[in-house]
Amino acid sequence: MRGPCSVITALLVVASSQIAAESDYRLQAYHHDVTAVGNAVVKPLPKRYLRGSQHVLDSNEERSVYSVLASMINEGVSKMPQAAEAVEKMPQAAEAVEKMPQAAEAVEKMPQAAEAVEKMPQAAEAVEKMPSAAMAGKKVSRVTKTGKKMPHAAEIEAVEETLHATNARKEPLRADFVEEMPHAAKAKEEMRRAKQHDLLRATEEADEALEKSWHSSEDTAAIGGASRGISSNVILSLKKWKNNFQGMRAMAVSGEHEDIIKPIHEAFVRLCGENMEPTTKEMTLIRNMLDWDVAASPESSHRQNLVSQAQRHVLIGLRIMQRDPEVWNEWNELSESLRFGVLDYLLNLHYQRWVRMYNIFKRHRPDKKDVPMNDKLSLGGNTDKNSALALQTHSKKQNLYPDEPSNVAWTSKKRDGSVLIERSKRTFNGNTDTASVPYKQLKMQSLKPVMPFLTRSTTSGHHSVSIKNPGLSFDGPIFAFVPPNVHKSQSLTPPLVHKDVDTELSLGGIYDRSTHKAPTVP
């Protein structure tokens, strides 16, 4: 019985393979292995039969056939898991076969090639204007997401709209259209590379312009010895942005210690000067940073947080500007290099302001000791050049805190438009630098209504940006300021309400409030 059973089993295996072949969805792995084993066995089979029959007639025939079938069955059993998995997928294959007529019908409804080619943009002209792929591949790197249309984006959108429009007409397929498809795909890939190349070139031009205009001051060397804070002689590159806003959630100021927080904030404002006007929340963030227990490198960690705060303010400024369609459209009409230049410069201005506030608070610690009056350190409201220079000279001679920064800002008028010229000398913690806006006129008339949106206070007050806004999500813990040595028996008071930098420009003396007024945001 073993012989017939083995033969029947082999026939069943062969029959199942033929059935799978008829459905045009063969069990490839199983069929391949069975075929290989069968070929290997059938080849030496005549020799085995003859060797067995030489000694005893018909003595080894049954055993030879059985051994061959047994090896085939064992090999098939080892492959059964793969076969079972393939069998499970057979219903899906049958369903796909049923949908083949629909696929064929969809192919017949594709647009005509002639009409699509007629409505395509001038591919040859676009390719001639695009840089070579090799140069683009070398220079393309990680670029910032700007959310605006790049060069040649209009052509790509026109192609897609043409395809959608012609696809709706359900016209038959043309052979020449199929031939043109690879060329269209290649042209689209070249356009994508051109966009990345143009974006990279614009950011590089913005970085070069900033490096030319942002020079360190070597004539006013270190004052007071070694540095005791974060150096301000640093240029942040727009290309190296890392949008990691962990811990950038809005800060909460405890209202139950108003009588303690208020004098600390007032003392800190006197130390910084009127033109910086740090808010209570900004002071809270700096105070909490100084109290963090960072074992490795606290200043490096603090610097990274100040960079993140500067990035956050730039993005919030863009978000506020986007709320006004007129201003946003005017902003998008500017060239990419000019837009990146403005964002790059604003990023460094915000960072400089945060570094100054951090170093001042770290040096004097108004939360832990009394701070003397510093009314002579007022740096705000100076629009006249002579008054600014006089203030600078006076501060050099009689400044109570010689390490404090002294800023001068004015606006000069020319026939072609308004050119903002800013000079700032910062001599705190032994680090000095001088920042000046490039003298090159970069369409400042167009930038005039845009700059207030980007430079206004975005930390608190009526014009703050909610963290629930999907465009700006800052995850992380909520900061809270609780002064030291506070008794639990102290009575609770209403939440602390403080005056922010309101709607006027205040970037550490970079823009003066009497020369530029920020428009009201609805």
From Swiss-Prot:
The portions of this protein that span the membrane are none
One Gene Ontology cellular component annotation held by this UniProt entry: host cell nucleus
Q: Which residues form the signal peptide?
A: 1-21
| UniProt superkingdom | Eukaryota
The alphabetized UniProt keywords are: Host cytoplasm, Host nucleus, Secreted, Signal, Virulence
Q: What is its main location?
A: secreted
Which subcellular locations apply to this protein?
Secreted; Host nucleus; Host cytoplasm
Q: Where is this motif: RxLR-dEER?
A: 48-63
Biological function? Secreted effector that dos not suppress the host cell death induced by cell death-inducing proteins.
- Belongs to which family? Belongs to the RxLR effector family.
Q: What is known of its domains?
A: The RxLR-dEER motif acts to carry the protein into the host cell cytoplasm through binding to cell surface phosphatidylinositol-3-phosphate.
Which protein is depicted?
A: Secreted RxLR effector protein 105
Please report the organism this UniProt entry assigns to the protein.
Plasmopara viticola
